């Protein structure tokens, strides 16, 4: 199967809030998704997210949408990552857990398959250090709800190739996202660092009685949040 055809088929390992959001985003844009989510009620959770995405898209636009991709729940990582162009890992934020998952992914996926993590802050160089082919690994950090918010931060590690970054950008653009390549590794990347700065300042403003939480919310919603 060619690389371009394989990128019409992706795999998601993990189906929490972010994982399910990725699934909905790809399905709604005509990409087939294999899912490995061994936790209880995983299918119910994913289907609920798909329903939420359907409602949201229907309210946002009346333009005819793409034919939806197919969804398949698999019983093993081996079956999940077979013949796909991209594997998205969205498991708990622990390096050891993620690296164990990557080892199993690499054991069963093609050498050309891209592997990405949805981590919100772990450095990609640390995550990729035990991979056999670390050049195909990167971080793709989205924002919740993934099926609505277009921004995704692409962060390469020490061994990530330029080809991998370029392919990742094309995948996200294909599903209507706005990828930003972070030029250097930094903890928490860029967007969350900005949010943290706003959060810290907001706490001080409220504590000192400068404004209320409702007023702060209005300042963001009706001011710079609209830019």
What are these regions (language model features)?
Residues 1-56:
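NAD(P)+-binding Rossmann beta1-loop-alpha1 motif at the extreme N-terminus of oxidoreductases
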Residues 13, 36, 74, 90, ...:
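Structural motif
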Residues 40-41, 57-114, 122:
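Rossmann-like NAD(P)-binding element
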Residues 44-52, 97, 163-174, 215-218, ...:
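A non-catalytic, amphipathic alpha-helix used as a structural packing/dimerization or gating element
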Residues 117-184, 188:
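Rossmann-fold dinucleotide-binding core
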Residues 185-227:
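Helical "substrate-binding/catalytic lid" subdomain
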